[in-house]
Design a protein with these regions (language model features):
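Membrane-proximal intracellular helices of multi-pass ion channels
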Residues: 1-482
């Protein structure tokens, strides 16, 4: 690994992270709020960019595997730490609480440490939403689209930062792919903002919520989240944008080239829609028969939460802690499943579960017919044993980390149900905590040790374990080539 190459890439990323702070600065000036916390953070970003640039090399032609892993890991860690500064400089949060809020924003988790958002300046609320937007599609993807290419290693870094069921790209060149994905991301955000305004939000609230919806983050500028609006049409519009943000974004690029039928033919997205639809109907029936809500309202709340949980956005519209256990457990299943590969959603991803089920089915058939060869397919793509084994590995590592975080959180004083619920929601980057911690989670009241564990869990879930785990191997730090 060449440290100079890593420094060169990091210098550009630090510079980009500083530029993003212009938006909250403009917001602070518009509303007459303090802007120095953002300016100071911007200067720190630019200073680090300059230092990294001086340590780097003039140009980067290619990156090897270790350099890509180092760039991804250091980018997410360093930007998360840099974006602690506005919270601390504003005097509203301690460094630890600021770190949890920053990581929750960057990873799209959406659980907050703020007990009351009414005391938070609008510029800082917008900054929270912007951290969602930057981390949602991926720091590398966005900066590859906006800034000069990083070399052939861009493709490797994008694969490490966001997962998909296929390595195939919508466009032949990685720069074109990043630009197309970013354009879709931008259009969806703008469309959501306009629709939210039409259904009753103020322009600021609409922008803040759209910056959280499309990256499936969940930060809201209001304490009551979407529940502050007594509008079924608004809730269903939020549901719509959460669902389309849970699909593989490459599908939308392909649909532009080949027609809308590409989306309807995608196996993973069809299964995802089936899961959301079935969950919504089951929860609505349960809420209605239990006398919790009348059927029309039960349908609205059920589908809203099915979309919010499966997309791992985590918006709330009511207190689901009073729901029957059956409905709450469906939410647990959805938050662990997550959205589609290549989307902004978290969780295990639907394609992995499809392939796990198909692999088990093929294994059972192999037992019945030992001489036959069975292939595992999803759509038109055939998956080989090595790819399927990697999915099995990830599945068990994912569950293993949930149990590990749960164990560590119980050591800090949490009860088992609360620790397990918090572990699941942070690993899946959901923000909804299906336990006694509450319907609107306030992480600020948790012990310091629990906050640190939760922050680690968020990062591990967002980068899907293996990228950060690679840093723990001694061979990663040796000078031999990988």
């Amino acid at each position: 690994m060449n440290p100079a190459v890593v420094c060169t890439i990091l210098s550009r990323l630090f510079f980009g992270a500083g530029l993003f702070l212009f938006f909250p600065v403009i917001t602070a000036l518009f509303y007459g709020e303090p802007f120095l916390p953002f300016c100071a953070t911007m200067l720190v970003c630019f200073l680090l960019a300059f230092i990294a640039y001086k340590k780097g090399i003039p140009s980067v032609k290619d990156l090897n595997a270790r350099e890509c892993i180092a760039v991804i890991s250091l980018t997410w860690l360093s930007v998360s730490f840099l974006y602690v500064l506005p919270y601390v400089f504003s005097g509203l949060l301690s460094p630890l609480d600021g770190l949890v809020e920053s990581i929750s924003g960057m990873t799209g988790t959406g659980a907050t440490v703020f007990p009351d958002l009414r005391i938070v300046p609008k510029s800082l609320l917008l900054f929270r939403a912007l951290t969602h937007w930057l981390g949602g599609l991926g720091i590398i993807v966005i900066f590859t689209a906006l800034f000069p290419q990083f070399g052939k290693g861009s493709a490797r870094m994008m694969d490490l930062e966001s997962t998909s069921s296929s390595s195939a790209r919508a466009l032949p060149r990685i720069k074109e792919t990043a630009k197309a994905l970013f354009l879709v991301y931008l259009i969806f955000t703008a469309a959501a903002t306009v629709v939210y305004i039409c259904f009753g939000m103020t322009p600021f609230e609409a922008l803040s919520h759209s910056l959280s919806t499309i990256p499936t983050g969940g930060f809201s500028p209001l304490n009551e989240s979407i529940g502050a609006y007594d509008s079924p049409l608004l809730k269903m519009s939020v549901f719509f944008f959460m669902v389309i943000s849970s699909a593989n974004f490459s599908l939308y690029v392909l649909a532009w080239q080949r027609g809308f039928s590409v989306i309807l033919q995608d196996t993973e997205f069809k299964v995802y829609l089936g899961l959301v639809g079935a969950a919504g109907l089951l929860i609505a029936a349960n809420l209605s028969t239990a006398g919790i809500l009348p059927l029309p309202e039960a349908l609205t709340e059920a589908f809203f939460y099915a979309g919010s949980t499966s997309s791992t956005t985590g918006f709330s519209s009511s207190d689901y802690s009073v729901w029957p256990a059956f409905s709450q457990f469906i939410l647990v299943i959805l938050l662990l499943t997550g959205g589609c590969g290549g989307s902004t959603a978290g969780g295990l991803k639907v394609y992995r579960l499809i392939l796990l089920v198909k692999s088990l089915y093929a294994l059972l058939r192999q037992k019945l017919h030992p001489n036959e060869i069975f292939q595992v397919r999803m759509g038109k793509e055939t998956f080989h044993a090595k790819e399927l084994l990697h999915i099995f590995y990830y599945f068990f590592v994912y569950l293993g980390f949930i149990f590990l975080w749960t164990l560590l959180m119980t050591f800090t004083g949490l009860e088992i149900p609360d620790a397990l619920g918090l572990s699941m929601t942070t690993m899946s980057n959901t923000g909804i905590i299906p336990t006694q911690i509450g319907s609107f989670p306030d992480l600020g009241q948790l012990p310091a040790g629990t906050k640190i564990i939760a922050a680690c869990s968020m990062l591990m879930g967002r980068l899907e374990c293996f990228t950060l785990l690679a840093l723990c191997f001694p061979s990663f730090w040796r000078k031999t080539k990988w």
